Regions:
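Non-transmembrane, aqueous-exposed alpha-helical and coiled segments at domain scale
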Residues: 1-241
């Protein structure tokens, strides 16, 4: 991979061991997918996929704490996927025991880590960060470092932003450094459809069934779906949604 002088300096450890390790991880990630360079993340905010404090996710919590201890901050404020349990919904003793004390016993401490690293605010927990009320709607052409599957699809297909389906933790690494590997849906060539899918149903198709059927067929390729305008129109409005 060809790096800029600044990126190479980070990789060489000139800005500390932690940032060097993050750059090394992103370089390896990019090389696995054939990236030959890194590009700047250009969106105002990021969005993280890992929002739940499962006790078994110790490596994640340890990594987050190491970033905090080293004074590493995300270059962007970020929203994050929903909490696993809505604390505003009443729960009985057994539910509290199972969910809050056993399954998600690290939830409170993990949320404190998220705040320390750059969480937008107390209400920034959502799968749909691009909604107007959330304030995290990227513009067309902006390069993102997101991981949440549905948000990545929406950002690419509806908003025209550019983002690969990154993994959890990889999302915040791109946000910390301000760079992501240049491959896949970030490139003009990678955004070109390799499948044409014609929808010829006699009634509006179920979104989950249609999406699953297309996904199982095209896998990692890019589909161009025709025929949905019959049911959804050509504008993204309440009728379409």
């Amino acid at each position: 991979m060809i790096l800029t002088k600044e990126q190479q300096a980070i990789l060489d450890g000139e800005k500390g061991e932690v940032l060097a390790q993050i750059m090394k991880t992103l370089v390896r990630y990019g090389e696995l997918f054939g990236a030959d360079s890194m590009v700047p993340v250009t969106s105002k905010y990021n969005h993280l996929v890992t929002s739940f404090g499962l006790k078994m996710m110790t490596p994640v919590f340890e990594l987050m704490q190491k970033l905090i201890d080293e004074g590493v901050m995300s270059e962007q404020k970020f929203s994050v996927d929903p909490r696993p349990v809505d604390k505003n919904v009443p729960a009985n003793f057994l539910q509290n025991l199972i969910f809050n004390k056993i399954m998600y016993s690290k939830q409170e401490s993990y949320e404190e880590q998220l705040k320390a690293l750059g969480l937008m605010d107390e209400d920034a927990f959502t799968c749909a960060c691009y909604l107007e009320e959330m304030g995290n709607k990227p513009a067309k052409g902006e390069v993102l470092s997101w991981a949440e599957s549905s948000a990545v699809v929406y950002a690419n297909s509806v908003l025209g932003a550019r983002c690969n389906r990154n993994s959890g933790i990889m999302d915040i690494m791109g946000s910390i450094l301000g760079y992501v590997p240049y491959f896949g849906l970030l490139t003009d060539e990678g955004r070109k459809a390799t499948w044409v899918v014609k929808v010829e149903t006699t009634k509006k198709p179920d979104a989950q069934l249609l999406g699953s059927a297309i996904g199982m067929k095209v896998m990692e390729d890019v589909p161009y779906v025709k025929g949905l305008d019959k049911w959804l129109g050509g504008e993204l409005d309440e009728a379409a949604c």
